[in-house]
Amino acid sequence: MAQQVEEIEQDLSHIHWSWPEAIAANPARSLATPDLAMDYFAYSPFWDAKSNNNVLRTQRRIENPAYGHAEEKVELNAFMSGFEYVVAHSQPPDLFVIHRREVESSGKRDRVTGAWFILHEKIYQCPTLFDVMSTRLKNATSLISKTLSTLSENRPPANPRTTTLWRSIPSVTSNQPDGTQPSSLDQAEKPDEGKKDDSLNGSSPLDGSDGKASPAGPDWHLFHALQATRASLVSLETLAKTPTQTTDPREELNNIEIAMDNQFGGQNQSLSGKGPNVKGGAAAVKNISVPFVPKHSAGHATSTTGLTPSIWGGSASLGVSTAAVPAREAGGSPLKWPGGDKSAPIAGATLAGQTGR
């Protein structure tokens, strides 16, 4: 029982086997047919001596030493138990696929328990699905672990003035002893201090001692500018694909007029060249001639034909009634009327109404 368990646990997937002398000894000097490939496979360590193929070879070769797979594949159908080897696929002389399948008591041979392939005269064992998935997952886990370790070692410093940037800095090799050479991470943490010290010391790119050019540091301004440009490419492409909207100036002007009419209740001046709007109608004021009014004393009432003295005080306006506005002199003081010191109101006098007189 222990020997059977050891045979089951034997794994030969890590090796491949070949025997060029055996191929050179056959009449074709190559694996020209599937029968020759099966006979070549029988010499390998992957061959199981308990198979039905080996049972037939042991019995028949006593009478026929040249007995091979060409004869045994006909007699294998007589077995109702055990397992056997068959050539499942062949592309002579380079590729052959060999299956090991179980033989049931009913004669079915559907269950495949092993697979091997012969590629360029070398025999390999096909891995199982479990082995493939396990190897791939272990490989992926190892790569992820190495990546996280590398990122943790080269983590950028926390700087509230700028965003976090992961930089790829080449390793610096020097003949200085350990502890004197600054690490690449320290250089990445202080990219501006080196520039500031160089500007204060007045150093130049050329070393004065040997005349060699010192390596220039990275241009971080250019780096940030390129990053900003790359970030705005998406919005620029969207803006370029969006068609421009054409607006009609007349329609926009009409919309402004409607909005002003709704806001001021019809008392605002029209923008389309018409006169001031009043409740009684729109009057077009083209030319207004204001006669010269001499300066009078404050003790006399002054009135120009059809015009009130409030024009000189600045209280007259287009399209707005000047009722309850005190009359003033040219000097700006209220006019004295014979009836008293009260300022005389002007009831319903508008500039538009005086132009016809």
Curated annotation (Swiss-Prot):
GO BP annotations, alphabetical order: regulation of transcription by RNA polymerase II
Keyword Ribosomal protein: no
Location of region: Disordered: 151-219, 323-357
Predominant place of localization: nucleus
Annotated transmembrane regions: none
Signal peptide interval: none
GO CC annotation, single: mediator complex
Keywords assigned by UniProt, alphabetized: Activator, Nucleus, Transcription, Transcription regulation
An MF annotation (GO) of this entry: transcription coactivator activity
Alphabetical list of Pfam families matching this protein: Med6
Assembly description: Component of the Mediator complex.
Protein role: Component of the Mediator complex, a coactivator involved in the regulated transcription of nearly all RNA polymerase II-dependent genes. Mediator functions as a bridge to convey information from gene-specific regulatory proteins to the basal RNA polymerase II transcription machinery. Mediator is recruited to promoters by direct interactions with regulatory proteins and serves as a scaffold for the assembly of a functional preinitiation complex with RNA polymerase II and the general transcription factors.
Name of protein: Mediator of RNA polymerase II transcription subunit 6
Source organism of the structure: Cryptococcus neoformans var. neoformans serotype D (strain JEC21 / ATCC MYA-565) (Filobasidiella neoformans)
Gene name for this UniProt entry: MED6
